[in-house]
């Protein structure tokens, strides 16, 4: 009987040490309340339309195609749709949000606004944009696009100043110079309106450098003024460079209201599209899967830069993207990462997704959900353990101390009895 508690304790410890519950490199969900934003690698409609039944084109398991939990468009991305005429209305809602897109705007596309511009600035813009998207989708359920109506009282129209290859910027819109202005040293305004959403992500952009036109250099200056609250948001050019600069964007999170766009120099810019954020939720980190090309094309790491704990978990493959349909579609590593969407998981962390909530040899960093902090094992050969690790250790120490005390007492009484017998 004395040995039974120690046997149970030892069995529990052995069972706990023998149970393997490592974090897995997948994206998953706690329950059915989830949504995925993607591109061709998760665009079921694209596969059905152009490659019937050839689902090797995707990294997504085709069993998820009828789930109604995916908004994806081949050849597009949320960033691309936000800024350019090549538009797809990404729309979705869920408690747990997953992103697997972004590859359709990379250094491979080499976009820059002007011939002497810089694609590096646009990669910086991409990182800043996705930072706002990821942070806000950790606290909002719903994402979609909305048009932003504006009123400009002049006669000039918007102009396609910023374009490269097939990409033409239309958000923000550039209002051309009025015919009666001899240069770009003028102030001009336009009203725009935000309504129908809880909050909005809108661009505020300037050329951060000396912009040359007809032998004159100009410093860009743009402001948005909230006429309801009196709050003003603004950017002024601070760089003195004349080449190698481009369109620097900040991404503001604004409430509904009436706004005034103001330009003090160069061309007026006005937002035409916004990310519509709706339905506040309890904080739930988003999950982002790296979106990159095969190494034959140049990619960037901007989604990784944007995805930081505690609001975001980033998942990536350790090998080059090598597809089975073509080199850029149907990679085994990324298919494995997305396979976690086929089942529920209790715990998410920076290291990965835990399949069980009982015990693990890896302590979860930035945990979310029901994460493994105690043993709870029930196998045919091992009794159920209901101890946290610390009490188990303390109990072992106490048992050891008790054994030592018992041995000391036994020796004491044996010596004492021997002395009494000798005296008798």
Swiss-Prot record:
N-glycosylated in the host RER. Residues 414-424 are intravirion. The keyword Nucleotide-binding does not apply. Residues 128-266 are annotated as: Receptor binding. The chain crosses the membrane at residues 393-413. One of its GO terms (molecular function) is sialate 4-O-acetylesterase activity. Disulfide bonds join 44-65, 113-162, 197-276, 205-249, 307-312, 347-371. Belongs to the influenza type C/coronaviruses hemagglutinin-esterase family. This is Hemagglutinin-esterase.
């Amino acid at each position: 009987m004395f040995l039974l508690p120690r046997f149970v304790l030892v069995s529990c410890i052995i069972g706990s040490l023998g149970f393997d519950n490592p974090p897995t490199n997948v994206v998953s969900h706690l329950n059915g309340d989830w949504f995925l934003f993607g591109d061709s690698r998760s665009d079921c409609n694209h596969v059905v339309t152009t490659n019937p039944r050839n689902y090797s084109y995707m990294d997504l398991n085709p069993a998820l195609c009828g789930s109604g939990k995916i908004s994806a468009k081949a050849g597009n991305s949320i960033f691309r749709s936000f800024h350019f005429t090549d538009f797809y209305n990404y729309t979705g809602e869920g408690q747990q949000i997953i992103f697997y897109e972004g590859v359709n705007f990379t250094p491979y596309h080499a976009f820059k606004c002007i011939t002497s511009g810089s694609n590096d600035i646009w990669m910086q813009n991409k990182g800043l944009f996705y930072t706002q998207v990821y942070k806000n989708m950790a606290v909002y359920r719903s994402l979609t696009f909305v048009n932003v109506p504006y009123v400009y009282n002049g006669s000039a129209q918007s102009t396609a100043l910023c374009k490269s290859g097939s990409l033409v910027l239309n958000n923000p819109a550039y209002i051309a110079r009025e015919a009666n202005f001899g240069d770009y040293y003028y102030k001009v305004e336009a009203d725009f309106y935000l309504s129908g959403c809880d909050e909005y992500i809108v661009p505020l952009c300037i050329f951060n450098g000396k912009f040359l036109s007809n032998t004159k250099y100009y410093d860009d200056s743009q402001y948005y003024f909230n006429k309801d609250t009196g709050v003003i948001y603004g950017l002024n050019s601070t760089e003195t460079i004349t080449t190698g600069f481009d369109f620097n964007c900040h991404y503001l999170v604004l409430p509904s209201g009436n706004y005034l766009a103001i330009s003090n120099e160069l061309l007026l810019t006005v937002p035409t599209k916004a990310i519509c954020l709706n339905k506040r939720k309890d904080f739930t980190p988003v999950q982002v899967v790296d979106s990159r090309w095969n190494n034959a094309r140049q990619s960037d790491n901007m989604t990784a830069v944007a995805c930081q704990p505690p609001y975001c978990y980033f998942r990536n493959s350790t090998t080059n993207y090598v597809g089975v349909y073509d080199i850029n579609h149907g990679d085994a590593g990324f298919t494995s990462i997305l396979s976690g969407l086929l089942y529920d998981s209790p715990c998410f962390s920076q290291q990965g997704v835990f399949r069980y909530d009982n015990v693990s040899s890896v302590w979860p960093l930035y945990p979310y959900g029901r994460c493994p902090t105690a043993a709870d094992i029930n196998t045919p050969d091992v009794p159920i353990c209901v101890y946290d690790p610390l009490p188990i250790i303390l109990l072992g120490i106490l048992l050891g101390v008790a054994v030592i005390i018992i041995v000391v007492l036994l020796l004491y009484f044996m010596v004492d009895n021997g002395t009494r017998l000798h005296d008798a």
